[in-house]
């Protein structure tokens, strides 16, 4: 890395394990400065509950970034709306969570931060606070005014991107259009090159129907939509293999020769990835004008403040973001 970069972190739901995980991140050195967008008292109290040392350094945007030393975090303060009891949701803190996301996103857009790593949020309590919220991905897409974003989950061995995300199953076939596939594959291909440093990405593409339609006998979306799009993009030089049946695609003979998989819908691709790498997975938002990675688990309210939360996914998300920063420099 040419110079030390700043990475901004949002711990997520304050009553969940996000603050625990951020405190655990501080128990080692990092080659980047970790700027945590959070309430100071929340982090200090949670560190005390866990019996871990923590010193908060003030965020100084006009000073050069410094590698993070053991036992420290850099604090970008955002005040809680209500005091926090570990494991107990407070509706007003839905506003606090969104404020941390907005400040972190804006800091990435204005060049303060080289990447954003997000902890788990509780969508229900944010909506109960009167804030329409479907997820991090959609929030950052709207706030950054990105034309289109793509959700990809990854472990060290497997990357799975989604053509559609949080849609009811009955709506998916209608959503798989030529325009959508062109857009999603273009973003996936571009970000594999620019953010992952893969010169000529090799992408496996799932069919939509069982057996990838069985030649039109089990649905015609492959013939009518997916194959024509793939043929057009192959003619432009993209290395695309598919459409392949999803029940056979996830085998070494295919995966060993691929850099990513494009699944048509959420539950087609993610169960395999989460089984293969549960606790080590990372959620990446492609198509944003900045790097964003996230843990692939929830708030685990029952574990908050107990010292039993696994920091593995957060570490993987941070390490991946650092690699992506290097690739984009």
Swiss-Prot record:
Its EC number is 1.1.1.262. One of its GO terms (molecular function) is zinc ion binding. Keywords: Cobalt, Cytoplasm, Magnesium, Metal-binding, NAD, NADP, Oxidoreductase, Pyridoxine biosynthesis, Zinc. NCBIfam families: pdxA (TIGR00557). Pfam families: PdxA (PF04166). Catalyzes the NAD(P)-dependent oxidation of 4-(phosphooxy)-L-threonine (HTP) into 2-amino-3-oxo-4-(phosphooxy)butyric acid which spontaneously decarboxylates to form 3-amino-2-oxopropyl phosphate (AHAP). The keyword Zinc-finger does not apply. Belongs to the PdxA family. It comes from Escherichia coli (strain 55989 / EAEC). It catalyses: 4-(phosphooxy)-L-threonine + NAD(+) = 3-amino-2-oxopropyl phosphate + CO2 + NADH. It is found in: Cytoplasm. A divalent metal cation binds at residues 166, 211, 266. This is 4-hydroxythreonine-4-phosphate dehydrogenase. Substrate binds at residues 136-137, 274, 283, 292. Binds 1 divalent metal cation per subunit. Can use ions such as Zn(2+), Mg(2+) or Co(2+). It is an enzyme of class 1 (oxidoreductase). The active site is located at the dimer interface. One of its GO terms (biological process) is pyridoxal phosphate biosynthetic process. One of its GO terms (cellular component) is cytoplasm. Its cofactor is Zn(2+); Mg(2+); Co(2+). Pathway: Cofactor biosynthesis; pyridoxine 5'-phosphate biosynthesis; pyridoxine 5'-phosphate from D-erythrose 4-phosphate: step 4/5. Homodimer. Coiled coil: none annotated. The gene is pdxA.
